[in-house]
């Protein structure tokens, strides 16, 4: 008999505890083992009840969500799914993802939500996925805020735009993207486009804070934006990104919502426009999206890289691409910045 997933619900609102508990336990594979009304009580119950997953509100008395996450990751690591109405607060959203929560879902409509049942299946699915993550790979990102003088020196190296770094990731992606761009030089002759699993409601606040803590200039992908060297464009997985050459012979982004395989669409369009000047990168995630797009990159003589499976929070996305034989290099997360830089440098020397 398969054991049920044990969940602890942490929220200061009695209504939300009841609603979340009822919708999760409507699935026969999930059992609510307890609840807590603030972070301090939640920590005590994590240690006593040993849940497989916790759902966590961010706005609570005694100990707020961010402080609670910090303590959880040090004292009693467990997968955390945030369910909060504070998605518009850039600092809180960013900090929660930086500290290593596996998912961040906005409450459907405010702190006391009467339509939370509309989100029932999504929350059930995310809790089930959280229960099988590799806990060893859940860790906080250590970042330093860049001052304006440092950013000017780093961001504006007057490089040409010769390459595209196209990055695809689903669940677990925001944390991994932060680590990558905190170490990757913005002086590479490239632009970067990232499609990742993050709620469109959260994305603007996340991008704003992301830009403050990495040397790259970071923007939300917008339709018609002309690609610039040293800029990272981030899009939600709910959008699709393609590339187009405009009347001024500039490469611009097209943002739409028509494809059910956003990563395949991203990689295929990148290959068609940039050809051998594209590096495709698959990071942590679930599903098989990206595999067909990687095949197109290889066909156009670009390079495909996958994060090493053992360093992924969710390895399934990468395993599918490796099994299909469309990955040129498998690289540990720590080695990704150096590998990407070396590939661009070696390609530039070959073409001189």
Regions found by a protein language model. Name each.
Residues 2-8, 14-25, 29, 40-41, ...:
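Conserved acid/base catalytic micro-environments in cytosolic active-site loops
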Residues 31-33:
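Short beta-strand elements in bilobed, periplasmic/extracellular small-molecule ligand-binding domains
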């Amino acid at each position: 008999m398969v054991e049920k997933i044990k969940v602890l619900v942490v929220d200061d609102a009695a209504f939300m505890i009841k609603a979340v508990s009822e919708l999760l336990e409507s699935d026969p594979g999930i059992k609510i083992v307890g609840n807590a009304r603030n972070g301090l009580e939640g920590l005590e119950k994590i240690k006593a009840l040993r849940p497989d997953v916790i759902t966590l509100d961010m706005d609570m008395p005694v100990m707020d969500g961010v402080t609670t996450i910090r303590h959880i990751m040090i004292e009693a690591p467990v997968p955390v799914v945030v369910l909060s109405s504070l998605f518009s607060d850039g600092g809180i959203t960013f900090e929660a993802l930086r500290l290593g929560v596996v998912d961040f879902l906005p409450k459907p409509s405010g702190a006391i939500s009467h339509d939370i049942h509309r989100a029932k299946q999504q929350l059930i699915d995310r809790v089930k996925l959280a229960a099988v993550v590799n806990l060893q790979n859940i860790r906080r990102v250590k970042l330093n805020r860049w001052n304006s003088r440092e950013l000017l020196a780093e961001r504006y190296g007057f490089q040409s735009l010769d390459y595209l770094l196209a990055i695809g990731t689903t669940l677990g992606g925001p944390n991994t993207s932060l680590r990558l761009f905190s170490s990757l030089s913005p002086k590479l002759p490239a632009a970067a486009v990232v499609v990742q699993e993050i709620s469109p409601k959260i994305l603007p606040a996340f991008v704003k804070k992301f830009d403050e803590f990495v040397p790259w200039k970071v923007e939300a992908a917008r339709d018609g934006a002309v690609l610039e060297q040293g800029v990272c464009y981030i899009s939600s997985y709910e959008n699709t990104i393609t590339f187009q050459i405009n009347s001024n012979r500039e490469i611009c982004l097209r943002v739409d919502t028509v494809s059910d395989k956003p990563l395949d669409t991203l990689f295929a369009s990148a290959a068609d426009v940039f050809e051998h000047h594209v590096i495709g990168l698959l990071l942590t995630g679930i599903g098989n999206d990206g595999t067909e797009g990687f095949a197109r990159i290889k066909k156009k003589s670009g390079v495909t890289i996958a994060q090493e499976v053992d360093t992924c929070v969710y390895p399934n996305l990468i395993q599918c691409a490796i099994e299909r034989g469309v990955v040129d290099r498998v690289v540990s997360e720590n080695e990704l910045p150096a590998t990407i830089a070396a590939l661009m440098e070696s390609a530039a020397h070959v073409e001189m």
